[in-house]
């Protein structure tokens, strides 16, 4: 797993780490029960504070993506398909909200948006 962070991003560094690990889990790049780098090792590799990595790991654990075993390390949690579905559904919702906002500004009707969605689902676009 290769995590690339950007100091110029508006997204906090711990969020970038969290998102990269989540994406690796969802895409199956990281397998169930696979050990993650230790907090300190990842912090050293990324040249950032271990507290930043710890915050990312803590949030991933709270969200059910990883589990930490005292004295052994952090591991990819068994996949909860419902968690993954909720995560992706939220992502879709965010995109739909952006589409809605753009359509309001551009005075695009609901029917026009529905027609575009239908064409996309039918593979016509």
Where do the language-model regions lie?
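Short, cationic-aromatic polyanion-contact patches
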Residues: 14, 38, 72-88
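Beta-hairpin "wing" of winged helix-turn-helix
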Residues: 29-30, 34, 62-71, 77-78
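A short alpha-helical element within helix-turn-helix/winged-helix DNA-binding domains
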Residues: 35-46, 60
């Amino acid at each position: 797993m290769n995590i690339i962070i950007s100091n110029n991003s508006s997204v906090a560094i711990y969020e970038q780490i969290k998102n990269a690990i989540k994406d690796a889990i969802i895409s199956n790049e990281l397998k169930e029960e696979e050990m993650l780098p230790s907090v300190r090792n990842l912090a050293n590799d990324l040249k950032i504070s271990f507290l930043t990595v710890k915050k990312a790991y803590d949030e991933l654990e709270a969200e059910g993506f990883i589990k930490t075993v005292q004295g052994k390390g952090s591991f990819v949690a068994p996949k909860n398909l419902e968690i993954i579905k909720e995560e992706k559904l939220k992502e879709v919702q965010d995109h739909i909200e952006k589409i809605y906002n753009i359509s309001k500004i551009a005075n695009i009707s609901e029917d026009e948006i529905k027609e575009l969605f239908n064409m996309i689902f039918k593979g016509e676009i």
